[in-house]
Swiss-Prot record:
Metal-binding found in the keyword field: yes
Binding of IMP, residues: 298, 333-335, 356-357, 380-384, 410
Native source organism of the sequence: Helicobacter pylori (strain ATCC 700392 / 26695) (Campylobacter pylori)
Active site per the UniProt annotation: 300, 396
Required cofactor(s): K(+)
Enzyme Commission number(s): 1.1.1.205
Pfam families: CBS, IMPDH
The name this protein goes by in its record: Inosine-5'-monophosphate dehydrogenase
Subunit organization: Homotetramer.
GO MF annotation list: IMP dehydrogenase activity; metal ion binding; nucleotide binding
Gene designation per UniProt: guaB
Role, per record: Catalyzes the conversion of inosine 5'-phosphate (IMP) to xanthosine 5'-phosphate (XMP), the first committed and rate-limiting step in the de novo synthesis of guanine nucleotides, and therefore plays an important role in the regulation of cell growth.
Organismal lineage: Bacteria, Pseudomonadati, Campylobacterota, Epsilonproteobacteria, Campylobacterales
């Protein structure tokens, strides 16, 4: 029998407090998603079909993190989810949605409803701006067969030149009391659009995680051999791809990673792995970040069904030891129950954490809402559950094409308590991490990693750590018992 090491998880260890002059409110939580993409907070929503679609991804990016849209949908639907995130707000919309004057109001309604926008520029066949159709133009129109050109606000319009700053645009929009400012070139060809909503959101969400064009960042999951899906997602503007597998240290994953890096210019996160060798091989194949975790998730049964995995603290430690030599970020995926677990993962060297169950219960998650015994819940399932595998994630567990009655699941379906908005949950998690860094005297995540010291605790120590000897009469928003 070969016992490689004693393996620990989050509840097995505690960090030792250090002398500190650092206040929690003063720490920086800026980190990295990949070697090229920054995060303003080290939180990622999981690529699960009950956790992340466009609503969760938008909420995460506005707060400074990022969401990874799951792949249990056809390519076109996943591309639409990415597009909704990228179109949700922008400093300057460089490829604005537009409509032609000969289209009907019914056509315009489809566009505005689909993209959740209140107006759309109108152009001719040469792309010249000839008007704008807004809510005010159509509010009292009952005949949707009318042509857009008959109802729109026609030229001359207040427009701006290419290269105008957001501050200049804001002044211009306030001066003329308009909500949309088309950007045109010297020939009056539509080149962009600035909306007052985007300017207001820049003030409301100062830490929003945005790309170079002022759009919210978003990632998307893909499977083995899905190069066509990857290409379409990159064209849609996805910021990072997550090559997602229950066993990231496999020949098919390595081959797919190499093919993507050869053919596309995009950062690729690869996982899941738990060993030094796997981390080294994925980095050699071109991985821009390593996702760590086999079996730590609350809905995952891989360790029980397959007898395979590694407790998450030791897994993170293994992978960071190798990845840090190449300056490749590590993402701790799974096993996070409390904000203290996040702090421990970061102190071990992870650059960010991926969260599933804590976000599955939020308003923005795509899971079903339900009431059970008078309490509110949302559905949550593992991507290795029968339900998720029949919807498209069977390839993640190397069972693609297997009949549903022959699937061997590595996850379950369940429910989690309803927890309000994503922002409420992230607020508590961020606050807990800030508190931890204050105890550690760490001004930033790098200092936390460099200086943190751990002790291994006993089962009695764990019992002492939790609430004990008292009945909770009022639940705390960050402690779940």
């Amino acid at each position: 029998m070969r016992i490689l090491q004693r393996a620990l998880t989050f509840e097995d260890v505690l960090m030792v407090p250090r002398k500190s002059s650092v206040l929690p409110k003063d720490v920086s939580l800026k980190s990295r998603l990949t070697k090229n993409i920054r995060l303003n907070i080290p939180f990622i929503s999981a690529a699960m079909d009950t956790v992340t679609e466009h609503k969760t991804a938008i909420a995460m990016a506005r707060l400074g993190g990022i969401g990874i849209v799951h792949k249990n949908m056809d390519i076109q639907t996943q591309v639409k989810e990415i597009t909704k995130v990228k179109k949700s707000e922008s400093g300057v919309i460089n490829d604005p949605i537009f409509i032609h004057a000969h289209r009907t109001l019914a056509d315009a309604k489809v566009i505005t409803d689909n993209y959740k926008i209140s107006g759309v520029p109108v152009v001719d066949d040469k792309g010249l701006l000839i008007g704008i159709l807004t809510n005010r133009d159509v509010r009292f129109e009952t005949d949707l067969s009318k042509k857009v050109g008959d109802v729109m606000t026609k030229m001359p319009l207040v427009t701006a030149h290419v290269g105008i700053s957001l501050d200049e645009a804001s002044d211009l929009m306030h001066k003329h009391k308009i909500e949309k400012l088309p950007i045109v070139d010297k020939d009056n060809v539509l080149k962009g659009l600035i909306t007052i909503k985007d300017i207001q959101k820049r003030i409301e969400y100062p830490e929003a995680n945005k790309d170079d064009f002022g759009r919210l960042r978003v990632g998307a999951a893909i499977g083995v051999g899905q190069l066509d899906r990857a290409e379409m997602l990159v064209k849609a503007g996805v910021d990072a791809l997550v090559l997602d597998s229950a066993h990231g240290h496999s020949a098919n994953i390595l081959h797919t990673l190499e093919e993507i890096k050869k053919s596309l210019v995009v950062d690729v996160i690869v996982g899941n792995v738990v060993t030094k060798e796997a981390t080294s091989d994925l980095i050699s194949a071109g991985a821009d970040a390593i996702k760590v975790g086999i079996g730590p998730g609350s809905i995952c049964t891989t360790r029980i069904v397959a007898g395979v995995g590694m407790p998450q603290v030791s897994a993170i430690d293994n992978c960071v030891e190798v990845a840090s030599k190449f300056d490749i970020p590590v993402i701790a995926d799974g096993g996070i129950r409390y904000s203290g677990d996040v702090a421990k993962a970061l102190a071990l060297g992870a650059s960010s954490v991926m969260i599933g169950s804590l976000l599955a219960g939020t308003e923005e998650s795509p899971g079903d809402f339900m009431i059970y015994q008078g309490r509110q819940y949302k559905s949550y399932r593992g991507m290795g559950s029968i339900g998720a595998m029949t919807k498209g994630s069977s390839d993640r567990y190397f069972q693609e094409g297997v009949a549903s009655e022959k699937l061997v699941p590595e996850g379950i379906e369940g429910r989690v308590p309803y927890r309000g908005k994503v922002s409420d949950m992230i607020f508590q998690l961020v606050g807990g991490v800030r508190s931890s860094m204050g105890y550690q005297g760490a001004k930033n995540i790098l200092e936390l990693y460099q200086n943190a010291e751990f002790v291994e605790i006993t089962s009695a120590g764990l019992k002492e750590s939790h609430v004990h000897g008292v009945d909770i009469t009022k639940e705390a928003p960050n402690y779940y018992g």
